[in-house]
Amino acid sequence: NPKGIDFYNRVIDKCLQENIEPWLTCYHWDMPQVLEAKGGWTNREMLKWFDEYVTVLAKNFGDCVKNSMVINEPLSFTLGGYMAGVHPPGTISFKNFYSSIHHVTMAQSIGGRAIRAHVPNANIGTTFSCMPVDGWKNKPANLKAAKRLDVVANRMFIEPVLGMGY
């Protein structure tokens, strides 16, 4: 929306005037309701919509913003929104959780490519929330459970971005 672009151009200009390095965060849990009504991150079409959106951001802000975070804390909004039900859309579903993980992981790559296409020298990344995971009392069953938790909590989004697959 042009008013939103104008607003953020003013914010970026003010940051630069004050010698503050602006950073662009493409997605920070703010799904438009019209897209959520179509399934949000559970809908594969979200990848096309996200590509178009990030392209608009890169074209409009890339001349002034060189640092971009494609997605902020993907585990928080996928787990919280699609599995635990504590963040929008507030559902509890393994199917929705896993499809959202897959689409968000792909969106990180798609968003990075969209930025790179318009801002070749951009610094591009994603903000991950991680946690230490240990097996209680080093018991085999606890160590096995800790390993599974580590995959979900720490590796699920990071390893694909690093080219290590799922």
Q: Model-derived features: where do they sit?
A:
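Non-catalytic scaffold segments within catalytic domains of secreted glycoside hydrolases
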Residues: N1-Y166
